[in-house]
């Protein structure tokens, strides 16, 4: 039974105004279907304008759309397939497969606009989530069911870090992942899909893409599509990983849509509803008594300015932040995680244990001291330092290099096999470096290795 039928009266880019009878206006967020002959265009109701016109945002390109075309109210929000059938598949914002592998026979279809779990259904049992990446596990550990932000400017390695996390989680934990590409490069999405197929982790992952060549409506809603698929698995008792690359593009698309809808912009040209939109998305990413969603969100930082409203609004929702720094890229250390800027709420002796907390604190202290001494070294040289400070500099440089690690997903570029290092091994390695056990080894022996024992082997080969 078709829903209410209206007529297209105005098209301005992705904004489509549709006239309905005043007593049968579609609800906000309803999906409107417009038959264009060769294809069907889906648009979402964003505003009611006057008595009989709804203003919608198209989820696909509007080329070929004309005034006078029929538009049918589907009487429900955009709905996407969920369940085991979505694993190993590639979707767009509407939940349509885009991998040329046939239709998805899903048991259930969920609307992308859903309420966040109620307060009484949420579970907060802080527990550490091992990633196998030394710098993260030691200094800014992730919480199971927490929200993690990867902050960094252009080209510092956010996407590579996300790919390594997907790889480690699938292989070491056997967990399910939902990867949502929001307004990023299609080439990277294509690479990710093919790499996942080759490495065999695709069967545990659903991929949803709304890339940077798509209209702002698709980029604004695709994060909700991925989240909806993840929520289904969580409610069925699974521990799910939700990757969003890039959450800034979600804000950026919201800003474009807001301007197109004629709202007055707020600070730095962003939409006045920035905090509300971000809150509506982030509040749904939570753990319940059934299962958990651990989310890792890449956050592009415009002009490396962390006070920009988009990254600043995201900050307030996160449990851990992993900050990638250009100054560390310049040192040739990857992953380029800034050990002093990155932080985690669960780096607490009651949650990670006394030993982990003490080693992490000492590592931060020695790096902080090294940073202070760098000014003196730049002016007077290392020889003018006291013996104690020379030892600090030597160990700090070893610690700095030991924070690097070869990645499995980077193996084809570096030629080095990737390493997964357990938390226990990580703590042991840093503890021994700080105690001076490896003072006689050259600092280059600590670059791009897994456990600390490999430094001894590498030193022999360098000698």
From Swiss-Prot:
InterPro entries noted in UniProt: AAA+_ATPase, ATP-synt_VA_C, ATP_synth_F1_bsu, ATPase_a/bsu_AS, ATPase_alpha/beta_chains, ATPase_F1/V1/A1_a/bsu_N, ATPase_F1/V1/A1_a/bsu_N_sf, ATPase_F1/V1/A1_a/bsu_nucl-bd
Catalysed reactions, as listed in the record: ATP + H2O + 4 H(+)(in) = ADP + phosphate + 5 H(+)(out)
Record's keyword annotation contains Transport: yes
Native source species: Clostridium botulinum (strain Eklund 17B / Type B)
Cited CDD domains: ATP-synt_F1_beta_C, ATP-synt_F1_beta_N, F1-ATPase_beta_CD
PROSITE patterns: ATPASE_ALPHA_BETA
Gene for this chain: atpD
Subunit structure: F-type ATPases have 2 components, CF(1) - the catalytic core - and CF(0) - the membrane proton channel. CF(1) has five subunits: alpha(3), beta(3), gamma(1), delta(1), epsilon(1). CF(0) has three main subunits: a(1), b(2) and c(9-12). The alpha and beta chains form an alternating ring which encloses part of the gamma chain. CF(1) is attached to CF(0) by a central stalk formed by the gamma and epsilon chains, while a peripheral stalk is formed by the delta and b chains.
Record protein name field: ATP synthase subunit beta
């Amino acid at each position: 039974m078709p829903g209410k039928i209206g007529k297209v009266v105005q098209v301005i880019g992705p904004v489509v105004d549709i006239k309905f009878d005043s007593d049968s206006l579609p609800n906000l967020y309803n999906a409107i279907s417009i038959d264009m002959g060769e294809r069907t265009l889906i648009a979402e109701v964003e505003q009611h304008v006057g008595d009989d016109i709804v203003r919608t945002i198209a989820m696909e390109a509007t080329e070929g759309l004309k005034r006078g075309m029929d538009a049918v109210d589907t009487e429900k929000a955009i709905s996407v397939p969920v369940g085991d059938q979505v694993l190993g598949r590639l979707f767009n914002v509407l939940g349509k497969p885009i991998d040329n592998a046939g239709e998805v026979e899903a048991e259930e279809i969920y609307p992308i606009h859903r309420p966040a779990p109620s307060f009484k259904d949420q579970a907060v049992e802080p527990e550490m989530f091992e990633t196998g990446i030394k710098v993260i596990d030691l200094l800014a550990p992730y919480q199971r069911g927490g929200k993690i932000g990867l902050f960094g400017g252009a080209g510092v390695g956010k996407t590579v870090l996300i790919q390594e996390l997907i790889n480690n989680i699938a292989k070491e934990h056997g967990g399910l992942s939902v990867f949502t590409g929001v307004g990023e490069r299609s080439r990277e999405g294509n690479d990710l899909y093919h790499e996942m197929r080759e490495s065999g982790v695709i069967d545990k992952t659903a991929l949803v893409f709304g890339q940077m060549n798509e209209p702002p409506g698709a980029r604004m809603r695709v994060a909700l599509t991925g989240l909806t698929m993840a929520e289904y698995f969580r409610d069925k008792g699974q521990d799910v990983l939700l990757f969003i690359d890039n959450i800034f593009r979600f804000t950026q698309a919201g800003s474009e849509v807001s301007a197109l809808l004629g709202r007055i912009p707020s600070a730095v040209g962003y939409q006045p509803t920035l905090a509300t939109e971000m809150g509506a998305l982030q509040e749904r990413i939570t753990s319940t008594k059934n299962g958990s969603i651990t989310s890792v969100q890449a956050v592009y930082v415009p002009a490396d300015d962390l006070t920009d409203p988009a990254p600043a609004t995201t900050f307030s929702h996160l449990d851990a932040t992993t900050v990638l720094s250009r100054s560390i890229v310049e040192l040739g250390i990857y992953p380029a995680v800034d050990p002093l800027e990155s932080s985690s709420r669960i780096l607490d002796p009651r949650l990670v244990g006394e030993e982990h907390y003490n080693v992490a604190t000492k590592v931060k202290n020695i790096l902080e001291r090294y940073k202070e001494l760098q000014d003196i070294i730049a002016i007077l040289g290392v020889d003018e330092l006291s013996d104690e400070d020379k030892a600090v500099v030597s160990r700090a440089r070893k610690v700095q290099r030991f924070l690097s690690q070869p990645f499995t997903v980077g193996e084809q570029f570096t030629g080095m096999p990737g390493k997964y290092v357990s938390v226990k091994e990580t703590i042991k390695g840093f503890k021994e470096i700080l105690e001076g056990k490896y003072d006689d080894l050259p600092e280059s022996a600590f670059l791009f290795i897994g456990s600390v024992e490999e430094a001894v082997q590498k030193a022999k080969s360098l000698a």
